[in-house]
Amino acid sequence: MKNQDQALIFEVSKEGRIGYSLPKLDVEEVKLEDVFESDYIRVEDAELPEVSELDIMRHYTALSNRNHGVDSGFYPLGSCTMKYNPKINESVARFAGFANIHPLQDEKTVQGAMELMYDLQEHLIEITGMDTVTLQPAAGAHGEWTGLMLIRAYHEANGDFNRTKVIVPDSAHGTNPASATVAGFETITVKSNENGLVDLEDLKRVVNEETAALMLTNPNTLGLFEENILEMAEIVHNAGGKLYYDGANLNAVLSQARPGDMGFDVVHLNLHKTFTGPHGGGGPGSGPVGVKADLIPYLPKPILEKTESGYHFNYDRPEAIGRVKPFYGNFGINVRAYTYIRSMGPDGLRAVTEYAVLNANYMMRRLAPFYDLPFDRHCKHEFVLSGRRQKKLGVRTLDIAKRLLDFGYHPPTIYFPLNVEECIMIEPTETESKETLDGFIDKMIQIAKEVEENPEVVQEAPHTTVIKRLDETMAARKTSFTLCKASSCTSLIRITKEELAEVGSFFVWRICPALTDSKLPTQNLAGAKKPGGR
């Protein structure tokens, strides 16, 4: 079968074909009817594919060959730090003492794992300049939300219930305003100046007695260091607010500068980015949060402590915001990050930043003659170009990204940050060689020349991939299915985008035929009996 003709797993299915022989039942058989109510039991068999083990292996091996990852090629996705993940991390994470333990074990039986967690916290405290760290948050945005909830708890404990606004720059990560909203804050945007930095005058204008915090990435998402950070911290602190550090770009200042020394009160880190946990396929991540002393009482419980008798979790924290994740963080990623930090050492981490910044500036200068450079100044770990010049010739940034696929490269981040027209954001990381950078640069230059000489080649790209382009018009208009979301309902409702926008995704149950008199068509996910009305 040709790769282009890859069948769906359901198309490979043949009735009666068996892929695995289950062993004899060696425990007492339990009937589902004795455990679940009838509403939750299928009345028909699930329509699952019937395939052999060989069918499965060939099918998913073929699909895996279509994937692109750091191990298979250059991955210059801006603001994502797609660096190589050393394989020693995987070896250590698979040690029996780490891989085979259970979070409900007695603390006395997992002292080695707890020691690793404690030491990792100490390393992160030193790296960030914070007073303590919690490893609980699962990833970056979860860390953001946790940090903002700590700030909220701090203000409320001090009687400042009117501090309901969080300020974010117009170049901020999209998760910043999203996390602020989920944490119960209103988001206020502060503008960037002509140099791509936060406009201090605009910051002074928006900061007031309602300000809970200012969220910043430093360097920012344009790859530029916020050189006025100390003055910004003073402005926010004088108004009674807190300064929050989004650690997405820590790779640019690792062992060179510390958020705590810049005036930040809260910081979250992305161990899966800066400290080489595998990412890009959905996780898992790890988003530890560090705080200054006045926020320690509100950290999620438990906190990990070291005493004369060993390591233990302290749950006696009356002012804590509660748990933010079951047990204590994504332990496997924490093991990988600890391994990386110990392998690199202080000098190695310092070199990480030096090479990341060098690689980004080298690429920026080589590409500047062929693409617009919105901010012509020294960058940090990443930089942004603009495809405005190419757009005037009828070629969009999206087309450029698609053309890169023909050469085996994962495209950079495009159309972000939002304050740069036709934005192309590139982050090479420190792990790429000059030869790799030159290969990518040469193709970017080739594409720029194609835009001028033969734009159709770029407009119609990609030409060599299995999948070409999505039908954007159809995708925008076509109806889709969404879950009912009622607690006892398994219906999948077919609904147009317009109908979904009118009702709201969390209130789809109001038009579910299983619960109302609505005439919208549905599919029942479980093939179960539909429950009665609410």
UniProtKB/Swiss-Prot annotation:
What assembly does the database describe for this protein?
Answer: The glycine cleavage system is composed of four proteins: P, T, L and H. In this organism, the P 'protein' is a heterodimer of two subunits.
Q: Report what the protein is called.
A: Probable glycine dehydrogenase (decarboxylating) subunit 2
Cofactors that this protein relies on: pyridoxal 5'-phosphate
Q: Name one Pfam family in it.
A: GDC-P
Entry's Gene3D superfamilies? 6.20.440.10, Aspartate Aminotransferase, domain 1, Type I PLP-dependent aspartate aminotransferase-like (Major domain)
Catalysed reaction, written as an equation: N(6)-[(R)-lipoyl]-L-lysyl-[glycine-cleavage complex H protein] + glycine + H(+) = N(6)-[(R)-S(8)-aminomethyldihydrolipoyl]-L-lysyl-[glycine-cleavage complex H protein] + CO2
Similarity-based family: Belongs to the GcvP family. C-terminal subunit subfamily.
Known function: The glycine cleavage system catalyzes the degradation of glycine. The P protein binds the alpha-amino group of glycine through its pyridoxal phosphate cofactor; CO(2) is released and the remaining methylamine moiety is then transferred to the lipoamide cofactor of the H protein.
List the CDD domains.
Answer: GDC-P
Top-level lineage group:
Bacteria
Give the signal peptide as a residue range, or say none if absent: none
